[in-house]
Amino acid sequence: MSLSPSLDSLCLRVQPLSEMAESRALVAVREALEASDARRTVWIALSGGLDSVMLARLAARAVKDCPRRLRLVHVHHGLQAANDDFEQLARRLASRLGLPLSVRHLALAETALKSRGLEAAAREGRLAALSACLAAGDSLWLAQHQDDQAETLLLNALRGSGGRGLAAMPPERALAVGGASPGRDQRAHERARLLRPLLGIPRHEILTLARQQGLQAGQDWCEDPSN
């Protein structure tokens, strides 16, 4: 009697990559839900791109097992015609998932553009618009993933940002209600929390999961023309 496992039995034991991707992502999202205050609202920043679309879908699925109040929030940058497409996709997804959606229109000040540059001004304006939705104790979820983490570290290194710039993005941090950075004397109950549930998940797994669900670029998520 041979003790060697057959090829068929080995195949049965191997979890398909798509299932592994789904399992890892769902575990990450459920952990983020458990870390969020059950009495408060979880806001998911929905840009309309692949990563935020999948984060919203995963959260809508996971919330059935870990009840939380979910809301989506989309920031319209008003910088290019494609921003209208992003907003329309966000509205369709919110309707499909049965989740409320808030849309914020961003107006970047000319002084901010000149002093900070377009990318930095848009990033800071977006975070301010998102955090303005929050009440104390709420959570704001961003869809940054493992590849974003690596890219951030590389860009900061190339810019010579120093020790602070080389620090990794934290999976979560305090966020002052209204968008200001929380001061040391600010009491905990006046803060919200920013979480990045997918920070440990590589982008290829997110894409694999989207394809497994039959989603398509241009139809179920928008590709950023500036990338």
PLM regions and their residue ranges:
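Core alpha/beta nucleotide-donor-binding catalytic domains of modification enzymes
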Residues: 2-227
